[in-house]
């Protein structure tokens, strides 16, 4: 009589394992997808912070070099009773000027606006980021507020899907720059 080799799995046992794995994947997938989305938004916010810091470097470099040809500068603004100088650079200017190195630079558009205090009673410079990478948008959020969790949600001033920037070009007049500052202050509390 021949011995039968019973060391393998039956078809039913293999199907049961496949069904259990499928159920586990279906349960875990929404959590993993949510984590991936939050990571992408977090990376985008970090990019916004790096663009704002690059604008700080560009402004400081232009002052040291005594050049006014870097970005857009408007002097004599008054916001909330304090005097400011407006400085703005587009993201493409930051990249082409060597202030930021990006492999996927063409994916980013937008501006970084800086309101630099010119009076002694003003606290710190205000850097406002408005940018998109064709997947997410930041509209008028200050550098100090960018890292906060409240901006990792949808809504005005926050990070959200889409490609619609409120301000995609630098102000060209003092009146426009001052109006933007007042709007940023009202909507997002950037000048408090």
Mark where each language-model region is:
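N-terminal secretory signal peptides that target proteins for export/translocation
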Residues: 1-4
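N-terminal single-pass transmembrane signal-anchor helix
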Residues: 6-33
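Membrane-proximal N-terminal amphipathic helix
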Residues: 37-66
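Extracellular/periplasmic head regions of type IV pilus-like filament subunits
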Residues: 67-134
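Short, surface-exposed interaction loops/tails
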Residues: 117-192
């Amino acid at each position: 009589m021949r011995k039968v080799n019973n060391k393998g799995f039956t078809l039913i046992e293999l199907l049961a394992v496949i069904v259990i794995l499928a159920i586990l994947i279906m349960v875990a997938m929404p959590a993993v997808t949510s984590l991936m989305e939050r990571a992408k938004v977090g990376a985008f916010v970090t990019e916004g912070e790096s663009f704002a810091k690059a604008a700080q470097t560009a402004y400081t470099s232009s002052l040291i070099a005594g050049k006014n040809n870097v970005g857009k500068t408007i002097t004599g603004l008054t916001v909330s009773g304090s005097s400011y100088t407006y400085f703005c650079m587009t993201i493409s200017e930051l990249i082409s000027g060597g202030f930021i190195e990006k492999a996927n630079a063409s994916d980013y558009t937008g501006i970084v606006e800086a309101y630099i205090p010119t009076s002694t009673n003003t606290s710190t410079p205000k850097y406002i980021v408005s940018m998109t990478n064709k997947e997410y948008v930041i509209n008028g959020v200050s550098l100090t507020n960018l890292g906060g969790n409240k901006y990792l949600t949808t809504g005005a001033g926050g990070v959200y899907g889409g490609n619609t920037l409120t301000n995609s070009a630098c102000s060209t007049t003092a009146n426009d720059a001052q109006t933007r500052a007042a709007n940023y202050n009202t909507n997002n509390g950037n000048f408090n």
